[in-house]
């Protein structure tokens, strides 16, 4: 069995890739599933809830940012690091999120991205 360095290490946004890569991929996958089911354009609101360690360390470890970027269609190993801050500023200041960069929904982070401390 051969193991490459790419199997051991994943490229992603930080400061904690363990709290960003998975959530970013999962958020993008969710939006992609909406698109595949023909529901992306009909989506009017999106609520996200984080639990466990993602909730406990989320903001400090960048999980919130990763979820927003994933829903917007970005991938952890493909996003230009120089575009992260402007993309997040755009989402947060306009309080809108373009799912997969295609369909815009109202997204007020304090209402629509919740950190659940207890399950």
Model-predicted segments: where are they?
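Fe-S-dependent hydro-lyases/dehydratases of central metabolism
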Residues: 1-119
